[in-house]
Amino acid sequence: MAVVLFMRVPELSLERYDLMMAELELDANPPPGAILHIATEAVGSVNVCEVWQTAEAAESFVERRLRDALAGHRVKEPLSYRIEPLHNLFAPDLEMISRIGASSVAALPHHRSLAS
């Protein structure tokens, strides 16, 4: 069952978030089961919303890759997140994601065909 992961990452600036995302090499090595990643800036934190194929896939990414990456960027607060079942995902214009310039999805050739 598809799920949504919600996470607030305190102590993380957008600059360090961008560095961490580059270091994770998600374009070249996407985590199994990942569908969509959205990040926003909040006061003193970055908020993340992700859609995953399963809760197990989301938890595996957090435990095997994300925790170490956050530690490498001096995030000391314990990571907290919640996972909820996905009820609906509506995306009427997938091509807009690459046009707004906030996406790494377009870097993956197999994703371009999904937006066509």
Model-derived regions: residue spans:
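Short S/T/G/P-rich N-terminal loop/turn motif that feeds into the first structured element of a domain
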Residues: 1-47, 53-67, 74-116
